[in-house]
């Protein structure tokens, strides 16, 4: 489940693809057929600097975030792979722009309850994400309380988990509050961190015989430790 360069042109930049692993495929099809398996994070922010949530600053932040976490700008396509059935495609050019009306939405609300109702509908109603749109952010400015903003980050579970999104959210607010920078992270280096979970298994390159041996040794060690615990109990 590693990335492969499949294209490079002036219009798209470099284009990379990789198959989804088993976990990602499960979330992918769960989202398509059941409309679930998406994550919505809701944060309440008070600011004294009105420019923080202007469209230009939020768009700049989202572009920078996609360049750090490139799966935010990926698309998913079903393939003929026998073991996975789908693949991610990341085009370098897509990470440097915002698709109008899709990735960033600036809205207004008159109460906190109104935003909570929106988030509930986002989770329980018709799915707002798709294989072509794996992430988006909604910014609600409170008309009844100037300076108060709700940030709702909506991401497909196939590209992130509950712990990973905490890092992403922290990075989002860091970029939002800092001056612009011209630094663009190396795409290949960032994609190297977005591999399938199977690639993180230290035993994946071992032969079947070696894996069985490792499993047997692990079972023996576990039983010895378990026996010691039982003996030490009063």
Walk through the language-model features, giving the residues of each:
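Phosphate/pyrophosphate-binding loops and the adjoining catalytic core of nucleotide-dependent enzymes
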Residues: 209-212
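Flexible, P/S/T/G-rich "lid" or insertion loops adjacent to the active sites of thioester-utilizing
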Residues: 214-234
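Non-catalytic N-terminal regions of enzymes
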Residues: 1-203
């Amino acid at each position: 489940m590693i990335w492969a360069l499949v294209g490079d042109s002036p219009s798209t930049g470099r284009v990379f693809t990789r198959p989804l692993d088993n976990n990602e495929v499960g979330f992918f099809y769960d989202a398509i057929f059941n409309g679930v398996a998406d994550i919505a994070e809701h944060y309440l922010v008070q600011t004294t600097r009105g420019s923080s949530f202007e469209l230009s600053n939020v768009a700049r932040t989202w572009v920078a975030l996609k360049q750090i976490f490139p799966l935010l700008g990926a698309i998913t396509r079903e393939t003929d792979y026998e073991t996975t059935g789908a693949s991610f495609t990341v085009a370098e050019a897509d990470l440097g722009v915002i698709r109008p009306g899709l990735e960033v939405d600036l809205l207004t609300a008159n109460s906190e309850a109104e935003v909570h109702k929106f988030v509930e509908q986002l989770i329980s109603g018709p799915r707002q994400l798709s294989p072509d749109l794996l992430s988006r952010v909604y910014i609600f400015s409170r008309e009844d309380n100037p300076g108060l903003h709700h940030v709702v980050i909506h991401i497909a579970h196939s590209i992130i988990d509950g712990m990973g999104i905490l890092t992403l959210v922290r990075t989002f607010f860091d970029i939002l509050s800092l001056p612009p920078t011209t630094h663009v992270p190396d795409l290949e280096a960032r994609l190297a961190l977005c591999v399938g979970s199977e690639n993180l298994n230290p035993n994946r390159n071992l032969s079947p015989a070696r894996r069985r041996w490792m499993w047997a040794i692990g079972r023996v060690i576990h039983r010895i430790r378990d026996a010691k615990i039982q003996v030490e109990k009063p």
